[in-house]
């Protein structure tokens, strides 16, 4: 199924401040399959290029991308998108409370600034993980 999206047009009558940040988005890349335990991919999901076009039209210059529940504990799609977007994007990843310091630093080096906790059905890490995860994230100045 294809969804027709308006990604460009007349300039908005509301001018956004320079440097405005979209602080919550999910991006699905077709080369990354869903993981067991999570929901499926959205029908007619927008891709990276569509999202970038929309941001350009709206005047959004930076973004924070959150790993989607469809990918569960697999951050590969998120890290791919961060590489594609470069300095204009940061990420919120699914981070195990048992992650090694070395693995956590590798995520930070790739643009991860926070850990996702999702207590709804299909979330990779729920609130039962928050105490142990908080110790790891706060020590590295990450958001949770």
Which functions belong to the PLM regions below?
Residues 2-73:
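An N-terminally biased module of ancient metal coordination in phosphate/nucleic-acid-related enzymes
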Residues 2-4, 72-144:
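Active-site gating/metal-coordination segments in enzymes
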């Amino acid at each position: 199924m294809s969804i027709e999206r308006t990604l460009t047009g007349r300039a908005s009558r509301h001018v956004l401040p320079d440097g405005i940040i979209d602080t919550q988005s999910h991006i699905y890349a077709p080369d990354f399959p869903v993981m067991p335990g999570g929901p499926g991919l959205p029908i007619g999901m927008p891709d990276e290029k569509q999202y970038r076009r929309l941001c350009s039209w709206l005047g959004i210059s930076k973004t924070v991308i959150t790993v989607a529940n469809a990918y569960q504990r697999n951050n590969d799609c998120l890290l791919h998108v961060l590489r594609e977007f470069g300095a204009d994007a940061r990420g919120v990843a699914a981070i195990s409370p048992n992650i090694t310091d070395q693995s956590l630093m590798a995520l930070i080096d790739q643009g991860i600034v926070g850990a996702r906790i999702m207590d709804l059905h299909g979330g990779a890490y729920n609130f039962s993980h928050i105490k142990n995860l908080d110790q790891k994230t706060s020590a590295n100045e990450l958001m949770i």
